[in-house]
Amino acid sequence: IPETLRQTGVPGAVVSVVSGPSLVFADGYGLADVEGGVAFHPSRSLVRIGSITKLFTWTAVMQQVETGRLDLDADVNQYLPDFQIPATYPQPVTLRHLMNHTAGFEDFSIGTQVADAADLPPLGEYLAAHLPARIRPPGQVSAYSNYGAALAGYIVSVVTGEPYDVYIRRHLLEPLAMAHSTAAEPVPVSLRDDLARSYDTETLPPQPIPFTFVPQAPDGSLSATATDMANFMIAHLNEGRFGDASILEPATVARMHARSFAAHPGLDGYAHGFKELTVNGRRTLMHDGGWEGFRSGLVLVPGCGLGLFLSFNGSTGGIAGYEILLKFLDRFAPAPATPEASESRPESTLTPAEPLAGFYHSTRQNESTIEKLVTLLGSLSLSVAADGTVRFRGQHWTPQPDGLYHSSDSRERLAFLVGPDGRRYVVTDRTAYELLPSSETLPVNLAVLLVIVLPALATAARPVGWAIRRLRGRPARSTTAGWRIARGLGVGAAVGALLFLGRLLVVLLGDTSEFSYGV
């Protein structure tokens, strides 16, 4: 970790390791607050764990499944008193879909951050006002959804009558003795002085990032210490127990840790909100989280009772943290002497397909707002060589006897699949991608831009030619008043088009994070 901090310029990091029912290691590295000169401390420094908060949300859902208040396979609309998920498809959205990120919601970023606590809306109001479009049938393919997790947390609040942060404190943080952690925003005064600062380490020198509020709280509002996170890991590795407390029944923990979705049986999938990650032939359960400069990861190895939590307070810590996680597993969770039993194989609506070249985009996409520009201009090219080798995401993937493709540059696997509606997908262990229709591919969109730009440039150049002729003393071409008006309107439209395209480039190539606060 110290070497990683030097290489990345990240100010600090914190880590905790558990084995069975015990915390076996915890430490802090570097600075939690550069300006204040405050060192990272594993049991005092709070970090914002981002999407790892979802694991607390999913655990809360399973608690309410135990009580009988929630059913993973029921239409979520029966739990929503103030708004409803539209019946875009015959199949309703369920809590299981939310946990598997297969609800079929489009993704959005605009309005997902709030700069001032006074502007934080009630969770239910926010979810009703920001209801995303349903763009594919539920249960078909995963598309990571922050909205889905927030919706699940809201449902827990509805059926229990407790605000999300209060529920998490009473039913998870307090039983797990996580006294130095909170899901509340703003962070309580008693903990505020111990909150680590995060930094944009892609700039020199690194710049501190202001505290930003999460309107979708169940998606990412938790702030926690490394040792408190160790208690959460211990409970999940020990059938829901931590000391004398229990947050889940053993059978519920086993159910939660079982695979609940995989697009292909040979790929990693989801386990009721946990992400599967196969390393050295071992199945691990993990989740990562990134929020405003913090980069965190949590991984459990049920087969050997091992858990790791790691967090950096710099924006360049994500990839380095993942590499440390893999090295940790290589060292402390090597390949088992006998292969682990394979996970159950939930039925998938996708079937294997032949490789198909073209342009693909992540299933985590937007279809109905201006954010679709990211999809249109952010597609990835996939090619298939004569020997069957696939080139995708800058990597070579070689076909295997089991129908999967293995990457030569990483530990990932890939499969080509087709849905019942004919949509074509490329699915890896981490992400699913959908084949774009030709009308939405990058070359076509660039061609459309050229069709707009070239005439605009030609029209806008006419006043330049007129000015040059005047400077050279050449007589102006005689034109009618109508022609002069039309020419003026054409030039104005051309200049407007060029200004729009210029602004578009600034937006796409510049810092787009401000859009998270809304437009």
Segment roles from a protein language model:
Residues 286, 297-314, 424-428:
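Short, well-ordered beta-strand elements
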Residues 28-33, 87-302, 328:
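Short, surface-exposed loop or secondary-structure junction motifs
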Residues 319-519:
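Peripheral terminal and inter-domain segments
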Residues 47-50, 142-144:
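Catalytic tyrosine of NAD(P)H-dependent dehydrogenase/reductases that use a Tyr as the general acid/base
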Residues 15, 21, 48-73, 149-157, ...:
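Active-site SXXK
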Residues 275-279, 299-303, 383-387, 416-419:
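Short beta-strand micro-motifs enriched in acidic
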Residues 1-47, 69-71, 78, 86, ...:
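Short, conserved catalytic-motif segment at the N-terminal edge
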